[in-house]
Amino acid sequence: MEIDQCLLESLPLGQRQRLVRRMRCEQIKAYYEREKVFQKQEGLLKRIKPGKSQKVRFGLADMIQDAIIHHHDKEVLQLLKEGADPHTLVSSGGSLLHLCARYDNVFIAEVLIDRGVNVNHQDEDFWAPMHIACACDNPDIVLLLILAGANVLLQDVNGNIPLDYAVEGTESSAILLAYLDENGVDLNSLRQIKLQRPLSMLTDVRHFLSSGGDVNEKNDDGVTLLHMACASGYKEVVLLLLEHGGDLNGMDDGYWTPLHLAAKYGQTTLVKLLLAHQANPHLVNCNGEKPSDIAASESIEEMLLKAEIAWEERMKESPSVPSLAQEELYEEILHDLPELSSKLSPLVLPIAKQDSLLEKDIMFKDTTKGLCNQESQDGPPETSMVSSSSKPEQVQLTPPAPSDDLATLSELNDSSLLYEIQKRFGNDQIHTFIGDIFLLVNPFKELPIYSTVVSQMYLSPTGQRSPSLPPHLFSCAERAFHRLFQERRPQNIILSGERGSGKTQASKQIMKHLTSRASSSCTMFDSRFKHAICILEAFGHAKTTLNNVSSCLIQYWELQFCQRRKHVTGARISTYMLEKPRLVAQPPGQGSFLIFSWLMDGLSAEEKCGLHLSNFCAHRYVSQGMREDVSTAERSLNKERLADLKHALNVIGFSALEVENLFAILSAILHIGDIQFTALTEADSAFVSDLQLLEQVADMLQVSTDELASALTTDIQYFKGDVIIRRHTTQIAAFYRDLLAKSLYSRLFGFLINTVNCCLQSQDEYKSLQTLDIGILDIFGFEEFQKNEFEQLCVNLTNEKMHHYIQEVLFLQEQTECVQEGVAMETACSPGNQAGVLDFFFQKPSGFFSLLDEESQAIWSVEPNLPRKLQGLLESSNTNAVYSPMKDGNGNVAFKGQGAAFTVMHYAGRVTYEIRGAVERNKDSLSQNLLFVMKTSENVVISHLFQSKLSPTGSLISSYPSFKFGGHKSSLLSKRIASSMVGVNKNYLELSKLLKKKGTCTFLQRLERGDPATTASQLTKSLADITAKLQKGSPHFILCVKPNTSQLPGVFDHFYVSAQLQYLGVLGLVRLFRYGYPVRPSFEDFLSRYEPLASVLLGEKKGQPAEERCRLVLQRCKLQGWQMGVHKVFLKYWQVDQLGDLWLQMQRKIVTCQKVIRGFLARQHLLQRMSIKQQEVTSIKSFLQSTEDMALKTYDALVIQNASDIAREHDRLRKEVHAAYHRNRQEEGTKRAEDQGGCRHAHSNSVPVPMAVDSLAQALAGPSSRSPSLHSVFSMDDSTGLPSPRKQPPPKPKRDPNTRLSASYEAVSACLSATKDAASEALTRPRPHSDDYSTMKKIPPRKPKRSPHTKLSGSYEEIWGPRPSGTMGQVGKHHAPGTLGVQWASPDSMPQCTPQLPLHLPLPQGDYDDDGEPVYIEMVGNAARAGGSETDSPDQGESVYEEMKYVLPEEGCGPGMLTFLPASPPLFLETRKAIILEAGEGSCQPLKDTCDIPPPFPNLLPHRPPLLVFPPTPVTCSPASDESPLTPLEVKKLPVLETNLKYPVQSEGSSPLSPQYSKAQKGENDQLTSPGFPVFNGPSRISPPATPPPPPGPPPAPCGPPSAPCGPPPAPCGPPPVPCGPPPAPCGPPPAPCGAAPAPCRPPTHFAFPPDSVLVTAAKALTNSDLPRTQPKPSSAPVLGPCSPFVKAPYSPGRTARADLRKASSTFSPPSPYSPPNSRPLSSPLDELASLFNSGRSVLRRSAVGRRIREAEGFETNMNLSSRDEPSSSEMASETQDRNANNHGTQLSSSLSSVVAAENGNPVTNGLAEDDGCSRLCLSGMGTSSFQRHRESHTTQVIHQLRLSENESVALQELLDWRRKLCESREGWQEAMQHPEPRAPPPPPCKKPTLLKKPEGGSCTRLSSQLWDSSI
């Protein structure tokens, strides 16, 4: 059964113990079972003989390691003699010397060093033996290694040297510091050495990145540079890597991120940095651990947990929006409750040991009946906090007075000083300045001058005194705070005075002000300081006759401030010389420590019973000073203070159980004092008299009773392997009893101080902060009693030392420096006799304390030896300050006889001390027996207290390294690599070159090791430590005066106060500050402190020497009274304030100048950015304008090229049509009749192929809802099938210059449609591909790229021809009228020569050829209706264009279905019609997908029949033959409608798609649409809305039935050419339709165009009263109503201006290309066409020259003409012509003619007359831009001129010559021009060729005049 230890630790105590017991039982059971199984397997065959022992052989390496650990020195020597290798390595990679350093085995360490073991060997963590010795604080090993030549500067894996692991104050630390100082290594040099490694990596990384290296490059293990820097704590390297894009979440091969490594190795600053840069805290490594799971400290773990929560919230809110993260976000984590277990020991006890201790603790409480009901262990005790009375509602401060500064008094003497102080004391003005020294008189009452409001009033930006505020402690603290950052050195506030003068309270107020004004979290630090002071007051203060709360120790507070942010980052308290003798014996009238009084009055009866303190006053330690007349108010106050103490202990980390344990230890201390000894034998051997009490004490201490009794009464020593036992006498046993109590209390007090320090230490990364300290020293005051003993001597000598330091700093140093610098000093001060007194006691080796330590080293010295030695010292001393009481101060003998007393002349007076018992009180070290017993205590706290070591000053050494607690030394030494790397990188050499090689004798002499642990030695080292700290900073003195000895408020004792003023030297201080020079900075310090002031005042004289620069600054500041020394400036104290004021004024002026300049620069920068932006906008506009110009030029060239190509093509095709017509008319009719019901084929290929639509003759023969179109009307013959009697073409009309040229015959045929029912047919709707339709559209159709298979057709009705190779479908042979039957079959099952319907089917995506051309087919609206009258619907006269879907057959052989979906429900039919796809003869193969047919051209009237567009046959004589011949024409006289067709830009090399199924509009997963035939494609995502119907024209009159087809088609021949060149890109959005929601206007890519002239035409159509109108649909919206679809699109101003220039250059152009509606008369297109046909002349004529040009290129064309003869009759109405020679009348005809022009054998049923010559090429919308429809180019005007020429042959010749020059690259075209052929006669007017090709041998002399018809 295995359970994780973390789980056990998280369980409650009782549950964990039960679980542990169960686990133990199961383990034992499993062990027995395993043994039984093992015995059964062995079979018990081999029994061990009795008496024969089994031996296990271990290796020598294992044995020697075990012997070193257990200090078996003889065994180690024996193993080395047997051959054990002294160089054996342990498992961690270290040597045996590492083990010796770990377990403090000095003897074996010396042996190993003698045998050559490397003292600098490093283990796998780069720890040398010196590192381990310092970490374990083994000074003997440290000294041995140093003497052996160990390198004290070796760095481990974390970059730490051994000194970093030596706890401050330990002997190991002292040895290392002394050695480094002896060899010339200071602390700054150590810091530079530690920075070598990170600076080296920083340099390498910079070089690597500058050379183009990858910041995220990984090594073989996947580790990046960021991983390495985060693990090592190199903050600067991490910042550099992050700036260059380092991957925060990069993982190595073990899935460890940089955040994992920073958390694991305790890099708190880097953890903050990574989290601030959005590192993911949720990533896990290969072990499934997040960074918070492996955090090295609780602060890092809490930080990471907080980051995880923030990350989750950020992901929930907005995953894409990163939140701002700063390092300050993680600085608010409070650590008010640190774990106590982390402070107990460096080596944490295992959980089994902790459980064992807890079990025994429970047993202990059970046996002693335990404690009564207590508060919950988890919650803090309920306390009633003491409300502070120092926060009044209103604050009234006394106004400033002239006597605020005593240094300004006119009369200086003792009486005047005393008078001013008394007067101020009477006015409650207890604060007074003496220059920079502060004088405080204790009022013995609370004054409302220490509130938070007052503290805020004294906040100053410069630290100078405010003239409007009286003197105050806060002002002194404010000055120290500002001096801290001005001088950038520590500041020390020293409080001195007698006991009860108010030093402790003054220090509290100073700390309160500093923490509140400079704390990042004021409430947190105020609370911590309050609780820390409460604990310190309880355990370190006592009630005396001079003070109710008298300090019994020296306190030195250190407040750490961040140098950059200027707020408190932590604090630490150092305590010295605790009055431990006060615990066991109090002077008369004084009490013990306050904690015992609080326990007596604050504990309840039950609690006292549990602690065995029912009779509290009966204990000896408290009975001496306990008063019986304690008032009830005082008892109540003590109870409240105890409650405050419990709360304070909870705050700093003690749980309720631990507080209970703490009180139990205090109770044990009191019970120890009650143990008495008695002598049962004559040898006076001591025995414990009360064994029950001893057992009770042992239970409370949780030690063995026998061991405790033996340790108290005997002394066991080991000498050369022998054990020596000595019995103590009762006196010695009592001495060790009291020493045990004092030691336990002292160590407990040290433990509490360390815990407080841990609580006050900020959790910020101390190593990364540059900190400065403000120290506050509070020493116990001078005291004198009737009987002064050794304790009073130590207290008064401490005050003597501090007074001497003040005199030395204030007087002696100034006097010495004045002499050295040659400055005259106005006043002189006598040094006094303090130096002689201090030398008498502290001088070595002849001082009194040295003699006392010698006597204390004896096991038990004889008392009379010390008086004798003291007498000899007094006689030999040269000072009169210390003398024997037998003599008076003048040396006269007072009395005879030797006595153990002497008199000392202190600075405060004469005091006589008795030395009786001084030796015993000086001893402060327990016997080894007592130490061993206390170390083995089952109480965790007691065991820890005695396992910890003591510092030389007697303080308990903390378990934490020294660098955990700032301080000046730690800020220099222990700023880790993660700190800011500032400073010069000094390349230090090896240790041998760095350290000065000196003899070890001097070093050993300076070590002064071996000092005994005595009170005198602790006092000496404490004073030395305090003095060293004070000398590092600038002092600020506060003199505290006690007004009376009775502690009464308002009482001023003149004599008592005058005595204090005299020995404090207040008068001397006043004179010093008035006449002396208290401020004496060096020249460099002066210039550095006032650098802004000096840099401005010096001007050009900055290069002068420092002395001259200081002189100039002082002169220009107009200061007087200063003096210049040789190296220093001597200033008066008020001159510092004046310089500070000038510096502040100058700083304000500088800030103002910088503000103005920065604002100016910012504005300039903004203007520059705006200018750059404007330039960019201008450049973009210029680029777009130039691009538009180039596009227009290209358009002009393409129009000319395209028109010429089409003209030649029409000429060639015209000849073929007429030749095939006369030759194959009869054959076509016969074949058409035979193949009416034949199987139709549909095929698909990657390259578009010609398509054919089955004839709808059967549907037209019967009753149909669809009227024949105008195409059919004008192509119908009579029943005999003879051609139309009109043989001559209509007369040539006059041309309008605005009419766009086009050679397309479809533009003409689009206007020649008529219906059967002339009464209900609107004749004015343009065809979708006509020029009018394109002109109407804002986005013209794009010109598709020409394909060799492109064919032209102007009708939907029939496409005849043989099945080409690769066809994949057949058309069903039998189908119902009105339906379209399609049968799918494999290509090999198709018949060869059958009429077919080749449909270009969609293939899967990827099967299409990018060069494929689109084939457009328009589906008939009502053709699928089998029957019905023409009056079934109001839409009977209109053709409804609907979407068609092909529904797959279920089983693969069933009929498919093409479903028509209405495109415009609001305007047209709502019914859905389907075309059944019937199965044919071949095998049926189902389609994969259902194909939708979007309505490409919706809402067309029946006279606008659907259009089938096939790729045209290109002409190679044009270099731009890839351009579409479907040039849009601008027919001004046709009423036009609007559609929502969108024409996307075609990419180069791809097939143009249909407008609704372009590549730009298709989805990512949509199937590719058919390049040419949208019928079988999927549904469009954009379905264009319906177009409102235009105003109808006059209805045509039907005449004649349809004719039968005639003429067989010839076989195809000739290879097609390859197209080239991309089509122009379309531009401009289509307008929204009326009656529907307007479509969003897509902005053009680059160009915008003016409004279409179609608006003019439409408006004209509505206002023309000459035309007959048909009634519009009721649901139709007005054409030009509010929702009119003719929306004005955005246009380009530049393009409009350019059009005006071009219009001016054209002789035929009107003033504006966009004429208003009334600019031209409106006429019917039928009237225009009738005038043309009635003219009798050929509009377009053939050109033999053009034919030769094409024939020279080897073209072979095949033209099959098949038509059907239908009876027809026509009526011609002639009206006046417009200026374009267009007739306004309408030519009506009811004869239906079927003229089929077939290409490649595909019969095409055409609804136009063969002779009209108005064949029109279908306009493709893919390649045309909007400006192609709206603008007239210059080249177009050229073609207009050629068309209007009277001599057409001459015009044609001019056109061909011009075209050849531009387009032809062949060399044979010149010869073709020399042999023109005669012009062929025009075809009959009743026949219209739709697809024209050049016939073999045809003449190309002239193009057909019909192709030049400009009426369309």
Swiss-Prot record:
Expression tissues: Highest level of isoform 1 found in brain. Also found in bladder, kidney and lung. Very low or undetectable levels of isoform 2 in all tissues tested.
SMART domains recorded: ANK, MYSc
One GO MF term attached to the UniProt entry: protein-containing complex binding
UniProt-annotated stretches for the region Disordered: 371-404, 1220-1246, 1259-1300, 1317-1373, 1543-1650, 1664-1726, 1756-1794, 1869-1912
Compositionally skewed regions (Basic and acidic residues) per UniProt: 1220-1238, 1869-1878
Span of domain IQ: 1146-1175
GO biological process entries: cerebellum development; negative regulation of cell population proliferation; negative regulation of G1/S transition of mitotic cell cycle; neuron projection morphogenesis; phosphatidylinositol 3-kinase/protein kinase B signal transduction
Modification comment: Phosphorylated on tyrosine residues by FYN upon stimulation with CNTN5.
InterPro entries: Ankyrin_rpt, Ankyrin_rpt-contain_sf, Kinesin_motor_dom_sf, Myosin-XVI, Myosin_head_motor_dom-like, MYSc_Myo16, NYAP_N, P-loop_NTPase
Annotated localization: Cytoplasm
GO cellular component term of the entry, any: cytoplasm
Keywords, in A-Z order: Actin-binding, ANK repeat, ATP-binding, Cytoplasm, Motor protein, Myosin, Nucleotide-binding, Phosphoprotein, Repeat
A Pfam family that the UniProt record links to this protein: Ank_2
Assembly: Binds PPP1CA and/or PPP1CC. Binds F-actin in an ATP-sensitive manner. Interacts with ACOT9, ARHGAP26 and PIK3R2. Interacts with components of the WAVE1 complex, CYFIP1 and NCKAP1; this interaction mediates PI3K-WAVE1 association and actin cytoskeleton remodeling. Interacts with KIRREL3.
Similarity comment: family membership: In the N-terminal section; belongs to the TRAFAC class myosin-kinesin ATPase superfamily. Myosin family. In the C-terminal section; belongs to the NYAP family.
Listed name of the protein: Unconventional myosin-XVI
Gene that specifies this protein: Myo16
